[in-house]
């Protein structure tokens, strides 16, 4: 059984692992790497191939983590900035989200034998996990609101203008429904969003820093491992859903 998880994309596949395993549940197959005796890495897009964000089996992944005993999960995402002041290579720790996905599976509780559950979303991301990461990370970092779109297309200028106007700070394609499903199963969840560029229409500046973005994501993952090794020393009174 494992207590901790890191969820991420292709940038994290180079993390040193003990072995690769898989687990199957009623929602499908989940592949994962064992990083140490307490921690696993779950590659959203698959281990040896690439599944687009719209087709990721989020329920299979989250249910697998729950079945494996996971209590804490840091997700690391690649995103674009909706604001000129949110510069590339910044990590934005999500404190809230806007979900503009359309055709994904958003709940485990589908009625009948699965029952129905209405989950509170007043604190979808663990503020204590954010705090611990901010204490240990030495790069550009801030908090903000994560917008998730369906993809696979990128957002239009007017879409990004709208997302910014309603409070969005960064935009990506993998944040939802992952955060919702983690909350449903009681997994304490944080989202670290690595800004790779500006969204369409945000600025005239052209920024292309794919390699640096991957380096930042990998650096963040190793910071998370250090947090896990320290045993997640939360303050008394920390609030979790």
Question: Where on the chain are the PLM-derived regions?
Answer:
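Metabolite-binding pocket within alpha/beta catalytic cores that recognizes anionic/polar moieties
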Residues: 1-119
């Amino acid at each position: 059984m494992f207590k901790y998880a890191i969820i991420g994309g292709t940038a994290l596949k180079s993390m040193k692992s003990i072995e690769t395993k898989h687990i199957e549940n009623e929602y499908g197959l989940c592949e994962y790497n064992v990083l140490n005796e307490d921690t696993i890495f779950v590659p959203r897009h698959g281990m040896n191939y690439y599944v687009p964000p719209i087709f990721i089996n989020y329920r299979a992944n989250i249910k697998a983590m729950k079945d494996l005993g996971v209590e804490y999960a840091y997700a690391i995402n690649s995103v674009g900035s909706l604001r000129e002041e949110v510069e590339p290579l910044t990590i934005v720790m999500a404190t809230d989200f806007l979900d503009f996905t359309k055709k994904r599976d958003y709940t485990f509780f589908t009625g009948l034998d699965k029952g129905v559950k209405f989950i509170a979303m007043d604190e979808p991301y663990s503020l204590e996990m954010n705090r611990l990461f901010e204490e240990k990370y030495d790069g550009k970092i801030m908090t903000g609101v994560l917008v998730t779109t369906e993809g696979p297309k990128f957002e239009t200028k007017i879409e990004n203008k709208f997302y910014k106007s309603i409070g969005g700070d960064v935009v990506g394609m993998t944040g939802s429904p992952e955060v919702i499903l983690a909350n449903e199963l009681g997994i304490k969840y944080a989202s670290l969003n690595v800004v790779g560029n500006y969204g369409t229409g945000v600025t005239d500046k052209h920024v292309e820093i794919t390699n640096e973005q991957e380096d930042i994501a990998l650096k963040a993952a190793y910071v998370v491992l250090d947090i896990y090794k320290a045993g997640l020393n939360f303050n008394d009174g920390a609030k979790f859903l």
